[in-house]
Amino acid sequence: MLRSTCLNRWRLFPQCAVIGVIASIAITPLAFAEGDDAVADVIAETATPIISPYDSRDYRVLTLENGLNVLLVSDPEADKAAASMNVRVGSAQDPDDLQGLAHFLEHMLFLGTEPYPESDAYQRYISNNAGSHNAFTAQQDTNYFFDIEPSALPGALDRFSEFFLSPLFNADHLESERNIVHSEYMARIRDESRRENDVLNQLFNPDNPTTGFAVGSRETLASPPEGEATLRERVIDFYHQHYDANVMNLAIVAPQPLDQLEEWVAERFADIPDNDLSVPTIDAPLVDSDTLPRYIERQSLQDRRQVNFYFPVPDPTDDYRTKPTQVIAHLLGDEGEGSLLAVLRDAGLADGLSAGVGRGDGNEALFTISISLTPAGAERLDDIEATLFAAIEQLRNDGLSEWRYQEQADLNEQAFRFQQHGAPQQEATRLSMSLSRYSVEDVQYAAYRMDGPDAERQQAYLDALTPDNMLRFYSAPDVESDTVSPWFNAQWKEQTPDQPGQALGGLALPGPNPFIASDLTLLEGQDERPNLLVDTPSFSAWHMQDERFNTPKVEWRVSLQSPTASYSAEEAVLTRLLASWLNDSLNESLYPAWLAGQSFSAYPHARGMTLSFSGWRDGQTPLIEQALEQLAHAEISDSAFERVRYQLQREWRNAPQASLTGQASRTLGEALLTPQWSSAELLAASERFDRGHLEDFRQRFLADLYVDAMAVGNLDADLAREQTQLMRAKLKPRLTRDAIANLTPLAASEEHSVLHPHSSRDESLVLRYLQGRDQTPAEQATAMVIAQWLETPFYQQLRTEQQLGYIVNAGYSPLLEAPGIALMVQSPDVESGTIAERMDAFLDEASQRLEQLSDADLAPYRQAVHDQLRQRDTSLAGMANRYWQATALEDVRFDRRDKLAELVLNVSLEDIKALWPSLREHTLDIRFNPGDEPSDVSTYREERSALPKVRE
C-alpha cells in the first residue's frame, strides 16, 4: 500500500504530520508554542466534555484530516496503556452470498501487515509486554482492542495502526483462519441465546440486514466457483468498501501526556484512507407489523423454561438525553413488593424477570420482557401474558408521573458524580463505542444523562406495548417440531393460544424509594493497607479507610465459617440452599436499596458462606442489620424452599450442557482440591431434603461459627467498629479458626492420568495441567514465568498453524497456592487423542527451545509477569476483593503480591530448567470426545495426598 510523502517523513519531521493531519481538536485546547500558529489555525472547535467532578484525568478529542475521530485520555496513575478502534461496520453489511465475511475479516487483520508480516508479530509483542488483545464483530460494529505496558505503547500502536493501513490478507492463512471461524461457530452452536436469535431471524423481515448469519462457517465462507472473485479478493474488496477513517473511532487511555499521545496518533493513523464513507444505515423494518401477534415455541437444550415478550419499537439510541424508555423498563422490571415479578413469584410461576430495549439497528429495536419460569409457570403462559398486560395498563394509568422520572434522574446523577473507571482496556473499548454513537460532550455522560421527561416519546413507547404488537417466544426442553432453524439447529413451531388468560391480582406500583442516600460527603483519610480492627479467638475484623477512588462507598465482606459447611455433599447442598434462600428472601424488600446504590448478596464456599455488602456509606448499617436478622430469625416457607432448591437443581442438571471449557476446569478442581463435590453428587443429595432439613441446618450452622470480616472504603474506624459490634452481637461466634477445615490442594499423580468430564457437548477437548512441586512463592514465580514463555508459541502453533480449534490457550493457572500451568484446546474436528499428541510434540519442542534459551531471552517474560503482578486496582470493589482473598490465604501483611513480583524478576534459567522436568512428570489431562462417559473423579481425588507447602 502506498504511503503519502508526508507520512513517510514523519519519523524525521513530526511537525509535517501534525500540521497535515489534524483537522479539529476538541475537549482540551492545546497550548501552542511560538511558531505553531499553523497548528492553531486548523482547530475547528473546542468543547468541554461533561465529566464527573472527581474525574481528574485529561481528555482531548482530535479529528484528523482523513475524518478519523480520536479520543485521548491521559491518566497519570494508569499502569497499563490501552487502545480500541471501533469500526462502524459489522455483520449487517455481510453480502448475502458470503455471510460471516465481516467476522472473517476481523480474524484476518491479526495475521500480518506489511511492516510486520509474521502472523504472530502483533500477539507476540503484546504478550511480551504484559498485555492482552482481542476483537469482536457485532451487527453494526467491529471493535479491536489491546492493553500493554505503557512504555511499549508506541510499538503497539505501530503494529495496531497497520491493521487499518497495510494488512496482508495472507493467502497462506486464508484456509486456516476459515477453519478457525468455523471452530468458533461450532463452539457456540449450543448457546441458547444464539439459538433463539437464529429462530427470531426466521420470523423477522428478511430485508433487514441484521437477520443474517453473523458468525460464518466453512459453508458460508467457501471459496467461490472458478471464474468468480476468490475469497481473498472478496475479503480485500469488503475491506476497501467499508473500512474508512470516516467510520472509525479510536480511543486511547494511557499515562502519557496528551501532547505525546496526540503526536503518536497523528504519526500512525493519519494515512488511513478517506473515501468519504458514512456510517451505514438500515431502513428496512426489523419486523413486518402485519405478521404480529405471533406465538412461538422453541426447544431449549438446557433444562430451563423461559418466555420472552418482544415488542418492536423505535430505536431509542438518539433519545439518550431524555431516555424515554428508562422509567417504563424500570417499572416493568421492578422486583419489589407488588411488582410483576413479585406477583408471579408468589403464585409459584416465575423466579426471575428483566425488562429493557435491545437489538437496536438505528431504526428499530425490541422492547423485551424476559421471564424465567417454574414448571408451573410453563403451564400458565396465557395467565402470565394477561398479568403482564395488566402491569402495562397500570403503567398507562399511573406510571409516568414526573416524580418517577426525576427519581431515576437523581439516582443517575449520584452514580455519575462518583463514576468509577474500569481497567484501561475496558475504558478504551467503552469510549470508542461511545464516541461512535454520542456527541463529544457526552462520551462519558450519555449513559447517565436524563435532561427531562419527553412525555410524547414516553407515550409512544408505551403505546407500542400492546397484544397486537407482540411476539411471544417460549422456550423449554420438551418442545418438539420438524421445523429447525438453519444455523443453530433449534426446533421451533408456531402456536395459537387456546383462550385468553386470567390476570393475577396484587399488582402495585412502587412508592418513592426510601433508601436514597443523603450524606455523600467524602471523608478524608487514606490507609495503605487493611488494619486489624477486632481480634478475638472467634471474630477477626479488618478495616481500611480509602479516599483514592473518590467515592463515599464501602465494601464489606463477612465470612461465616462453620465445620458443618462441607463435611459431605449433603452439607454442601444445605450451605448453598441457605445462601440462596437468604438472597431470595431479601430480594423484594432490598430491591429498592439496590436501585439506590446499596447491594447485598450471600454466596457459599467450602468453609461456609460470605455476606457481601456494597454501596454508599450512608444507610449501610440498617442494611447489615436487616440481612443478619433475616438470616437468624426469618421464617423459611415451603414455597421459598422449593423455589431456591429448584433453581439450584436446574443449575446442576444443566451442568453437562455448560461450556466444555468450564466443565473441564470444574473437573480439574474436583480432582485436585478437597473437599469438592460434582454437580451430579450435589443434585442427588438435594433430592433428599425438605424445608425442615434447611431449618435444622440453619440452627446448627449459626450455633458453631467463626467469623472473618473486612471493610474497605470511605468509612472511618469508629463506624467500622460500630458495625463490627453489630455483627458480633447478631452472629455470636464461638469457634476458633482452627475448628474450620481448609480447602486443600492435592498432588497430581505421576502416572499422567486422564479424566473425562460429565458433558453432552459435541466438541473434543484436552485440558492438560502441569503442576508445580510445592506451594512456595519461589515455585509460583518460576511457574508464572514459564507459563508466560509458553503462551504465544502454543497459540501460534496449535491454533494458527495447526488449526486445531478456536479455543486455544496456555497460561498460569494456580489452584489456591498450588502453582500450575494449563494448556487447553477445544476442537470441533480433531479428537482428544490427536490433540494430546500435538501437545506432547509442542512440549517436546519447548524442552529443546529451553536448552537454547538465554537469560536475555528470558528477561521480557520475567518483566511481563512482574508488570502484571504490579497492576494497580482500578475500582474500590476490585481492591476490596484482592485484600479479602489475601486474608483467606492468611496473607495478613497484604504484601504477598509485591513479594511475588520481586521473586519473578529473580527467576533464573537454572530455576526454570530445574522445574521443567517435574512439570512434565506431574500432569493431569482432562479429555473429552463426544459420547465419553464421565470419570469417577472422587476416586482419583481420594487417592491423592496434599501437595506439600514446602519441599523437604
Predicted regions: what they are:
Residues 52-84:
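Mature N-terminal segment immediately following signal peptide/propeptide cleavage
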Residues 1-11:
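N-terminal secretory signal peptides that target proteins for export/translocation
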Residues 16-28:
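Bacterial N-terminal signal peptides
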Residues 186, 278-337, 425-441, 446, ...:
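His/Glu-based metal-binding/catalytic segments typifying zinc-dependent metallopeptidases
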Residues 73, 78-94, 101-102, 119-163, ...:
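M16 family metallopeptidases and their MPP-like homologs
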Residues 31-35, 40, 44:
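Boundary at the C-terminal end of the N-terminal hydrophobic targeting segment
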Residues 178, 182-185, 191-247, 253-265, ...:
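Hydrophobic, small-residue-rich alpha-helical packing segments that form membrane-like cores
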